[in-house]
Amino acid sequence: MSNLVKRAIFGSLYVGLILAALLLREHLVYMIVFGLLAFLGTWEWSNLVSTHRLFPLRRIFDATAAVYLFWATHEIADKGIAYAAFLVPYAGYLLYILVRSIYSERQAMPTDLAKVIFGQIYVGGFLSIANIFYTDTDTSIILLTIFVSIWANDTGAYLAGSTLGRHKLFPSVSPKKSWEGFLGGLIAAVVATGLLLGWEQCYIGVIISIAATWGDLF
């Protein structure tokens, strides 16, 4: 199976799940899809930064904590600040990872702790922000636009880069990325944003494209 076919299949699955979660306005579907994103995203982060290689159960616990953070912030965004007490167990988790780090290798402790906390912010934290947009029907289209534009940027960058790519964007970090691919992704993201929000808001597509590219390089 070619890389293009794989990207098309997974891209269609990704878009389909996101559309179902955001357009059906069914809280259960939304929570399942985005909770799955939080779990898998945190798990993948652990793989990327090589945390808990000797303790795989910690990966599961950290990924589950990201899902809980997403759920708790959804309840607060949906029902009000009175439900902020739902964050208490998550505060307990943060205390746990601080204590846990004490029993790690002393030399690696600061680095490992920073990786875990940043992963929670990078995945669980940013997905939790989505709750602010989702619970407000007037701004939920912005949330949809962000995810569709990210997919459009990735697809446009791949198609342009694989066919026209000549000038490397950042070869020391990502040898396959090119300026042509970046421009292709930028155009695709701007078009997607313009179609969903109106052309006067297409600057959002520029921001999304740049942020997505930097995120990949990071």
Language model: regions and residue ranges:
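Membrane-embedded alpha-helical bundles of polytopic integral membrane proteins
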Residues: M1-S178, F182-V206
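Functionally important transmembrane alpha-helices
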Residues: A212-F218
